[in-house]
Design a protein with these regions (language model features):
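Conserved beta-strand segments of alpha/beta enzyme cores
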Residues: 29, 67-69, 133
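A structural alpha-helix within SAM-dependent methyltransferase catalytic domains
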Residues: 21-24, 78, 100-103, 125, ...
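Short, flexible turn/loop "capping" segments at secondary-structure junctions
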Residues: 24-25, 77, 142-146
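NAD(P)+-binding Rossmann beta1-loop-alpha1 motif at the extreme N-terminus of oxidoreductases
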Residues: 1-56
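Rossmann-fold dinucleotide-binding core
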Residues: 114-167
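Rossmann-like NAD(P)-binding element
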Residues: 35-38, 42, 53-111, 119
Length: 167
């Protein structure tokens, strides 16, 4: 299995920002998308605030902001992404509709991970194209400091995608 290089993060609340920082610390290229127009400044402020801890924990010299880009549409953020992290509000209607859109615009083999803490993955991915790529990846918080992630498959999630996600 090839390592994942391109990650999309949808939603830039506390969990989404945590995922962005963690992915950047691991050298991933990260695309961010949020409906809120002020998300860019919020993300950059949190990266700056947390950078001293992140650099120590991951033993890196800096968080490379060249690997971070912000996008205005869902279609743009999903283009060429291999791993998609959804961090939308904890609401079935929102997540089901979002997963349907993600399924339309993402690469057919892209893994889709919802950061949901209590919703069922089979229901979240019920309208998603290729539901075998969908799963729950619920992180411990703060995401960029605590390495634990609860990975939960849906009924149709493939074993291959589970293994790749756990890496």
């Amino acid at each position: 299995m090839n390592p994942i290089k391109n990650v999309a993060v949808i939603g830039t609340g506390v969990i989404g920002i945590g995922w962005i920082i963690r992915c950047l610390a691991h050298g991933k290229k990260v695309k961010a998308y949020d409906l809120k127009t002020k998300s860019r400044s919020k993300v950059l402020k949190e990266i700056k605030r947390s950078s001293q801890y992140v650099k120590k924990m991951f033993r890196i010299k800096k968080i490379d902001l060249k690997n971070l880009s912000f996008h205005k549409t869902l279609k743009d953020v999903l283009f060429n992404s291999e791993f998609i992290i959804e961090c939308a509000p904890e609401n079935y209607k929102i997540k089901i509709n979002l997963m349907e859109e993600i399924g339309k615009y993402s690469k057919p083999r892209a893994i889709i991970s919802s950061s949901s803490s209590g919703l069922l993955p089979t229901k979240i991915y019920s309208k998603c194209l290729n539901p075998e790529r969908g799963l729950i990846g619920h992180p411990f918080n703060p995401v960029y400091l605590l390495p634990g992630v609860e990975v939960v498959p849906g009924k149709k999630t493939s074993k291959k995608n589970m293994l790749k996600t756990k890496k």
